[in-house]
Amino acid sequence: GNYVSKAGKNITKGDDTKDYRNSSGLLMGEDGGPEYLTVFNGETGAAMQTVDFDPPRSILTSSKWGDSYANRSERYLAAVAYLDGVHPSVVMTRGYYTYVYAAAYTWDGTDLKEQWLSTNTPTEENGGTGCTVKYADGTSKNNTNKTLYAQGAHSVSVADVDNDGYDEIIFGSAVLDHDGTVLTYDGRG
């Protein structure tokens, strides 16, 4: 609707007249339409800024998510964490049971900025690349032996589990460190 496509300082985002549902009524893949993350003013309800949601549902085909009806690709969790130990960040996750993506965003009162995107595939020994984190400055880190893949749960928690002064994201039996890398996982889901 208009409240999303013309939110905040963005002039126009998307086509608010197009119906993106498929013949089964589902929003799937590249044809599933755009997705957004919006910051609203808590006092007035006015949209302050809208950005494209990362990762988009089209990042994987439905079969890679583990089903063909958009159930796992449309599973979202959110948390607020102090990833730098001082300022709040929002961490948004997409996916359960198989592929998992997590993105951290900061809000400085004017701009909503992505800090990092953590992509989690099977570990290298299982034919994947493990955990890859891309940062806003264009750099990246990769750990082929640790992953959130198949470690999901129906909740996400936040705590400073390694006592370093920065919050970590607890995702089922795995822990994402404050920089988006996998701190630990037990491989049992």
Residue ranges and their predicted role:
Residues G1-G189:
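Beta-propeller-forming repeat regions
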